[in-house]
């Protein structure tokens, strides 16, 4: 899927100016990136020019409002912002960040009871507001494992939504999911619960078993959603290319080019065992860039001035340029062929003063059915075709006629016919 590549943008609000757009759009376009996760402030909108500039370049922003779950921000505070973003062409928004981690909650609120219920009570009003404005709410990424076991957290969320029936959470369900590898190989945990035993929370994985804490977390989440809601969610893989965010550690075992290959491999058309299905919409690398003072800069793919830090990026750009050039050359040659040969395929029939024998019409039916050629009786007209099938019945066309077609550049297929049958 060509449009899967994406990035997480700067983790501050200081890089939404015109100069930033001018710097990063060409870089993102040269990588054929289609998604950009933007950290969205609650007090003011990201400038319209920045949002529309991305969209016009074919890059769809995913706005992430990552304020703490029980902060003072109310849905009403975001009403004007969400309306504006929708009018500017934004489609996807995320509220909160890793709500199964203590850091997502204000001090003292984590230990209070009914954590998942309290999360859902906060979350659903934001979801409703987003949908009222025509936006797609994306369920926030959970921390694999986490301070509240992520599989338990997600399952309870899904069960509560189903029990309440106050909101159809299952319609067009999108999720952001961690794709951190945690130093496991890319196929760790692949297949989800259909292949592996459900892991015991915070316990060492049994010998011969694998768990969900790795690149394939989305497999396990998909199983849970299918089990509870009987639907297939759409996924955005976040923190793509990372071993673990907590330690600012890229996955050294998988290069940028390898991760790109995994992201772009088509389902069912690749030998890669990590091929992603079509419901994985985007793979967002962590991190496009960061300020020099930001610790996240250790794992960014570009420095703050747009210079690649990852060795594989220039090679990948060159690969894209070559592929684009080949596609353009093919398109030009195809249009040139159409201009040189106005007719693609011509069936040249002999002409008699009294008409065409009925058995000739019967014989040419398979050609007409399979090739749908232009049908005619003129050698001169046939010279305008890329391919000519000559129905040479009883030597109606001379060798001179055949040579004339070949000299015109036509690909000639001659059918030699006599009154008894056909010999090719």
Per-segment meaning from a language model:
Residues 1-43, 60, 329-374:
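Boundary/entry segment of secreted carbohydrate-active catalytic domains
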Residues 38, 63, 97, 139-143, ...:
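Aromatic- and acid-rich polysaccharide-binding/catalytic face
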Residues 69-81, 100-116, 188-201, 243-252, ...:
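Surface-exposed, active-site-proximal loop segments in enzymatic domains
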Residues 330-424:
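Extracellular glycan-binding segments that recognize GlcNAc-based cell-wall polysaccharides
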Residues 41-43, 49-151, 382, 396, ...:
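Substrate-binding cleft of extracellular glycoside hydrolase catalytic domains
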Residues 5-19, 24-27, 53, 247-339, ...:
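Aromatic-rich peripheral "rim/lid" segments of glycoside hydrolase catalytic domains that contact
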Residues 7-21, 34-49, 67-77, 100-102, ...:
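Acidic-and-aromatic substrate-binding clefts and catalytic sites of carbohydrate-active enzymes
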Residues 58, 121, 214-277:
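Catalytic-core region of carbohydrate-active enzymes that cleave or remodel glycosidic bonds
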């Amino acid at each position: 899927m060509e449009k899967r590549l994406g990035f997480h943008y700067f983790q501050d609000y200081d890089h939404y100016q015109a100069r930033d757009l001018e710097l990063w759009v060409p870089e993102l376009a040269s990588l054929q990136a289609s998604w950009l996760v933007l950290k969205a402030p609650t007090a003011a909108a990201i400038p319209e020019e920045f949002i529309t500039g991305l969209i016009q370049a074919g890059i769809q922003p995913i706005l992430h409002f990552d304020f703490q779950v029980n902060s003072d921000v109310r849905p009403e505070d975001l009403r004007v912002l969400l309306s504006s973003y929708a009018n500017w062409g934004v489609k996807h928004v995320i509220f909160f960040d890793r709500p199964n981690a203590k850091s997502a909650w204000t001090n003292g609120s984590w230990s209070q009871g009914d954590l998942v219920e309290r999360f859902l009570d906060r979350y659903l009003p934001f979801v409703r507001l987003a949908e009222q404005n025509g936006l797609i709410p994306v369920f926030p990424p959970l921390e694999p494992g986490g301070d509240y076991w992520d599989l338990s957290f997600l399952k309870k969320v899904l069960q509560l939504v189903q029990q309440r029936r106050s909101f159809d959470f299952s319609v067009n369900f999108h999720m952001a999911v961690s794709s951190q590898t945690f130093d496991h190989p890319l196929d760790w945990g692949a297949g989800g619960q259909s292949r592996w035993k459900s892991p015991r929370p915070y316990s060492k994985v049994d010998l011969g078993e694998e768990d969900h804490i790795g690149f394939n977390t989305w497999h396990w989440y998909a199983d849970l959603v299918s089990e509870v809601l009987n639907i297939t969610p759409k996924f955005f893989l976040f923190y793509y290319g990372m071993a673990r965010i907590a330690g600012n550690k890229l996955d050294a075992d998988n290069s940028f080019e390898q991760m790109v290959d995994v992201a772009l491999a088509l389902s069912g058309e690749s030998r890669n065992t990590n091929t992603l299905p079509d419901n994985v919409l985007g793979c967002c690398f962590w991190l496009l860039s960061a300020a020099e003072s930001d610790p996240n800069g250790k794992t960014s793919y570009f420095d703050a001035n747009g210079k690649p830090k990852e060795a594989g990026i220039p090679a990948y750009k060159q690969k894209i340029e070559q592929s684009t050039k080949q596609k353009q050359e093919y398109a030009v040659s195809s249009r040139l062929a159409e201009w040189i040969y106005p007719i693609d395929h011509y069936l040249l029939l002999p002409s008699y003063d009294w008409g065409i024998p009925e058995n000739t019409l019967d014989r040419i039916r398979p050609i007409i059915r399979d090739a749908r050629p232009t049908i005619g009786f003129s050698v001169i007209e046939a010279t305008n075709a890329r391919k000519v099938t000559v129905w040479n019945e009883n030597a109606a066309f001379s060798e001179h006629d055949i040579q004339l077609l070949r000299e015109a550049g036509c690909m000639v297929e001659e059918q030699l016919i006599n009154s008894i049958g056909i010999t090719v």
